[in-house]
Design a protein with these regions (language model features):
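N-terminal glycine-rich FAD/FM-binding segment characteristic of electron-transfer flavoproteins
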Residues: 1-113
């Protein structure tokens, strides 16, 4: 099964942590799909689609995703989760806030650094 990468960005460009997470995801499986969630983040989505390790980009946009609130992001990821063997995110404040919520909603444990 494919790996789902959660892209981190500022609605304009990808954050460098996303590149690190993409490399980690590709070590699990070569079929890496990425989800980018935000508002007016088309440029970041385009940059994500140009990463050689990413095979597919899922672009989700709405005004309530603009401020990167984990409580808004988690349900989106959970809906996508059944199609993936692993979900990968950066190991910073963004990922450490979001991933436990996703794990709880999926009734599973997470592996973190």
């Amino acid at each position: 099964m494919s790996v789902l990468l959660i892209a981190e960005h500022n609605n304009k460009e990808l954050r460098p942590f996303t590149l690190n997470a993409a490399t980690a995801a590709s070590q699990i499986d070569a079929d890496v799909h990425a989800v980018i969630i935000g508002q007016n983040c088309g440029d970041a989505a385009k940059a994500l689609s140009e990463l050689p390790l990413v095979k597919k980009v899922i672009h989700v946009e709405a005004p309530y995703y603009e401020n990167f609130v984990a409580e808004n992001f988690a349900p989106v990821i959970v809906k996508l989760a059944e199609n993936y063997s692993h979900i990968v995110s950066s190991a910073n404040t963004f990922g450490k806030n979001l991933m436990p919520r996703i794990a709880a909603l999926l009734d599973t444990s997470q592996i973190s650094d």
